Amino acid sequence: MSELDSQVPTAFDPFADANAEDSGAGTKEYVHIRVQQRNGRKSLTTVQGLKKEYSYTKILKDLKKEFCCNGTVVQDSELGQVIQLQGDQRKNVSTFLVQAGLVKKDDIQIHGF
């Protein structure tokens, strides 16, 4: 009888809160690079999800110098700090972040159009 008791499966609740030590699916932190259409041919590239210990102003300064565009760091209530760049800079930003060693290529998600 003791063997049967140890083999009885327990109930699994998929909607229960995951424990901190359980790193299940969906816990991977991605860097999201999006493009938003403004008026006419103008567009805006946003970078969200970088680690908080990075200096966003220094990253922005390097991005602006590298791509010859203007940009700013915006504080959003839900998303935290977001880097905004003028123009469609999705590919440029992703290659820059990988080459600088800030983000792995697998951790970048590019959105838009």
From Swiss-Prot:
Region described as Disordered: spans on this chain? 1-24
Sites where N-acetylserine occurs are at S2
A Pfam family per the record: SUI1
InterPro entries in UniProt: SUI1 (IPR001950), SUI1_dom_sf (IPR036877), SUI1_euk (IPR005874)
In Gene Ontology terms, what is a biological process of this protein?
regulation of translation
* Gene3D superfamilies on file: SUI1-like domain
Could you confirm whether the keyword tRNA processing appears in this record? no
A single Gene Ontology molecular function, please? Answer: translation initiation factor activity
Q: Which UniProt keywords apply?
A: Acetylation, Protein biosynthesis, Translation regulation
Could you tell me which NCBIfam families the record lists for this protein? Answer: SUI1_MOF2 (TIGR01160)
**Family under the similarity heading:** Belongs to the SUI1 family.
According to its UniProt entry, the function of this protein is described as: Probably involved in translation.
Name of the protein described by the UniProt record:
Protein translation factor SUI1 homolog
Organism, by scientific name, is Brassica oleracea (Wild cabbage)
